């Protein structure tokens, strides 16, 4: 019986204390309207799981905030998109996560939808290598 209790406590501790929200390398498609194509770049972003719960009884006095794995700190990097027309602005600035945490999704800076377009979406349909 003590083994079952220990295992249960261990699982609870693991779920609460050991959030696996961490930096991960991803490839994103970047595009410039003036260039009419996309290129792929490697960057760092946050991914993983956070402890959350959905209460059965909704309490209007206590808002239900679902925590998500999101950035805590960002830096911005700039890359020159090759092959653009000479008159076009070929610089593209994108965010790079440097620290992650479990927190409320900030819809002012993040796509908080269930199914966003995804990091490899290209509206022009053409990827250049």
UniProtKB/Swiss-Prot annotation:
SMART domains registered for this protein in UniProt: GHB (SM00068)
Gene3D superfamilies cross-referenced by the UniProt entry: Cystine-knot cytokines
GO cellular component, one term: extracellular space
Primary location recorded for the protein, binned into one broad class: secreted
Alphabetical keyword list: Disulfide bond, Glycoprotein, Hormone, Secreted, Signal
Disulfide-linked positions: 21-69, 35-84, 38-122, 46-100, 50-102, 105-112
Alphabetized GO MF terms: follicle-stimulating hormone activity
Superkingdom to which the source organism belongs: Eukaryota
Record carries keyword Kinase: no
PROSITE patterns: GLYCO_HORMONE_BETA_1, GLYCO_HORMONE_BETA_2
Similarity comment: Belongs to the glycoprotein hormones subunit beta family.
Job description of the protein: Together with the alpha chain CGA constitutes follitropin, the follicle-stimulating hormone, and provides its biological specificity to the hormone heterodimer. Binds FSHR, a G protein-coupled receptor, on target cells to activate downstream signaling pathways. Follitropin is involved in follicle development and spermatogenesis in reproductive organs.
Subunit structure comment from the entry: Heterodimer. The active follitropin is a heterodimer composed of an alpha chain/CGA shared with other hormones and a unique beta chain/FSHB shown here.
Listed name of the protein: Follitropin subunit beta
Organism: Pongo pygmaeus (Bornean orangutan)
């Amino acid at each position: 019986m003590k083994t079952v209790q220990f295992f249960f406590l261990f699982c609870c501790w693991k779920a609460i204390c050991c959030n696996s929200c961490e930096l991960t390398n991803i490839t994103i498609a970047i595009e410039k309207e003036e260039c009419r194509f996309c290129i792929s770049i490697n960057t760092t972003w946050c991914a993983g799981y956070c402890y959350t719960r959905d209460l059965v009884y909704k309490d209007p006095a206590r808002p239900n905030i679902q925590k998500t794995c999101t950035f805590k700190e960002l830096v911005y990097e700039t890359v020159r998109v090759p092959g653009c027309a000479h008159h076009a602005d070929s610089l593209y600035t994108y965010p790079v996560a440097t620290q992650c945490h479990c927190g409320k999704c900030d819809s002012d800076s993040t796509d908080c939808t269930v199914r966003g377009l995804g990091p490899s979406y290209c509206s022009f349909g053409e990827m250049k290598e």
